[in-house]
Every structure is written in structure tokens, then in C-alpha cells.
Amino acid sequence: MNSINYAIIGFGGIARNHALAAYDANLRHNLPYSLNLSYIVTRKPIEISVPGITNVTNLQTVLEDPNLDFISICTPNESHVDIVEQAIAYGKPIYCEKPLASTLLDAEKMNKLVHENNVINGVAFIYRFLPAIALLKEELEKKTIGSIIDFKIKTYHNSYLNKEKQGTWRTLKTSGGGALLDLGSHLIDLIHYTLGNIKEIQYQSRIHFKDRSEVDEITRGEILLDNGTLGSVEASRVFAEEIQTDQMILFGTTGSMKLDLTNPYIIQIHDFNTGSTLYKAVPEKHPSMRFYPKERNSLGFFQNCHTAAIIDFANKLNGMKDTIGADFTDGLKCQEVISKLK
């Protein structure tokens, strides 16, 4: 396969990260194929100044193109299921922005469709591609801090303090949820990916700006994993700090591990027995750095992760077996946990 051609469905903010990923991938990584953005599908025509990209307003036109290898869904949550149904009819592989859907019922339907029709699928849970997460998983396997007593993972964003967010699609009930679905879904996937499946969760949730949002702005969840480990997750869209909080902390019987999700090259390991703290950096030759740039070449952790995630999905299409990206089954697992928020 000399080229992998894809179409982005929708062209809001997150779609631009999916688009930039193709150019970043081709310019900075020695791929066995060229990753090409061929189409951008929008409801109304837009001007595209980049050569080689065609803007269309009819999804079927794109799906009928035999040279199209996959679609990337970047539309509001409630529209995902309809787009997946259309793509399935043409057998097109599907890469979908998180969350998988706006409702558990839609997520179940989407997962069933791709499996019944043997369609390759992926979900953009991009935090999996942070090199520090790969390092954390290795340290967990080595039991560097003993058995896990507790964990805390949280993300505090401030964007919905902006009054202009009132009435935007992510503030409406039709989106399926607020801070937990939008931000917390990344965290829930990280818990599943690094620590194990969530067995039980109890939520506390609130809306502070009731005139602006119909969905949760702050949500905390107390968690019990299948293996008996306790922990918590917290997501907010209305917490302002000098430096944004995106943090994961694990407390073990012989110490702790901490990482800042926005600083993807280092984990902090504290040893209770010696009282020492090690700041362990990800080696430049580490497997997790294969499609992730060195710190001096970073475009920011968010874009870096999007690029790595789309390369991973393209690699799956190209027949590679060592991919780590989330799929619709993983997306459904997250949706099941989120759906327990009433």
C-alpha cells in the first residue's frame, strides 16, 4: 500500500488536528506509505486553500470513491451513529473522535455494526500515545511501587468559563454529556488501558453556570476496579489555574508514581523506603517514541498524540500487528462507565 487516503467528516476545531496529523506524519516519520487527506466533508461549502483536498457536502460522494481508505469522524457526538451506518454500507474503515457516541444505545449499535461487517475501526483516545504512559505501564508491570493502594486521575480545563460557549453543541443535552463525556472519557480509557477495567463507579456531578449549560461542568467519580483497586476520576470544564491540571497519581505499598499528562516525557517515582524521588525520562529510542517527536520538535502534546494515533490507525490498515490504538469495543467500555452518571 503506497498511499492511504482518508476523508475528514466535519471541520470544527478537532478536525484541524486530524488534518494536520497527515502532514506531520509524512514530513517527520519514515512511513511505508503516504498518508493523504483527500476530502473534507462539511454541511456547507468551505474554501480549502491546500492543494489535493476536495471539499464536498455529500458524504455518499466520498464513500463511493474506491481510492478512499478510511474516514475520520469529527462531527458532534449525536451524529456519529448515522455516519457509521453509511460508511458500513460501503465497507469503509472508520476512525472516530471520542466519545464513541452520545448515548450508550448508539455506542452499542456502532460496535455491533463494525464487528458484524468486519470493518476496521478506531477511536481517538489519544492519551494512550503519551510516551510517559508507556513508561508508566512498564513500571507497573515491574511493581516498582509495589501493589497499588489507590489512584487519582484528573483534568481541569477552563474553556467553559467563557460566556460565548453558551448554546454551543457541547453544552446541550443532545451531545450526551459534559465534562465527563468530553474530557473524562480520555481518563476512563487511560484507567482501562493502564490499571484494569472499572467494575463500579459512584459519581458526584454539578452544573455551576445553569444558564449556560444543560450538561455537567464538574464531575467526580469514586472507582472500584475488577481487581479490587480503589481510585477516583475528576473532570472539570470550568476550573482556571495558571497551569492546567492534567494529572495521574498512583499510590503503592512502597511508593508512588506521578505524571503530568501535558509533560509526556517524564514520570516521577517516589520510593518510600529510601525517601528518594526519581524523575525518569523516556529514552529517545524507546518504542513509544517511534511516532512521537523529541521534546525539542514538539508541536504540543495534544497534536503529537493526534499524529501518533492516526499513524497507528493507518498502520493497522497497512497490516501492522503491534498497534495500540483504541477501537469501538474500548469506546463502548468507556460509554458504559459514563452512562452510569444520572
Where are these regions (language model features)?
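Rossmann-fold dehydrogenase core element
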Residues: 4, 109-126, 146-151
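C-terminal helix-rich "cap/oligomerization" subdomain common to oxidoreductases
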Residues: 23-25, 30, 70-72, 305-342
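N-terminal Rossmann-like dinucleotide-binding module
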Residues: 1-51
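Beta-loop-alpha module in the N-terminal Rossmann-like domain of NAD(P)-dependent dehydrogenases
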Residues: 51-113, 305
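Predominantly a Rossmann-like dinucleotide-binding segment in NAD(P)-dependent oxidoreductases
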Residues: 127-213
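C-terminal glycine/acidic-rich active-site capping loop/insertion
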Residues: 126, 225, 249, 254-325
